[in-house]
Amino acid sequence: MSRLTLLVTFVVVLALEPITTGNAAPSGDAKRGEKLFSTLPCVSCHDVTKPWPGGDICPNLGNIATEAARLVRTREYRGKAKTAAEYIRESIVEPNAYIVPGAAYRAADGQSVMPKDFGSTLSGAQIDDIVAYLLTRR
């Protein structure tokens, strides 16, 4: 095989390789995430059976995967996430990155009512599990 043929073959193979865009499924386990979500204080504020945003205390999360994917493409969103998984993770570890519009979701100081310490009190694996679970809520 000539060098030119090898080079062309190599370029074609590279062109066919999938490029990672951050849309890959999270490494977490959705079943473990569901259990964590129901045993941590998450369920005391969030309802996963009703559609987003809604909710009296915090946004409902019944269709958060769909809404998060839509939200990160809007002008109103000011966070850093580019995918639904990134948005959900950001909401857990950095809840002030984007606060869903609505007075009920803000404390008197204008900050999110979501606890700000989950990034330090939960392990990375636990957060991955919760993200994986919430991505099942379409």
Describe the residue ranges of each PLM region.
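Soluble non-cytosolic domains of exported or imported proteins
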Residues: 79-86, 121-125
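Bacterial Sec-dependent signal peptides at the C-terminal "C-region" and cleavage site
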Residues: 15-27
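Extracytoplasmic
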Residues: 56, 87, 109-111
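Periplasmic/extracellular electron-transfer cofactor-ligation site
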Residues: 26-82, 93-107, 136-138
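C-terminal capping alpha-helices of c-type cytochrome domains
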Residues: 26, 107-138
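Bacterial N-terminal signal peptides
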Residues: 5-18
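N-terminal secretory signal peptides that target proteins for export/translocation
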Residues: 1-3
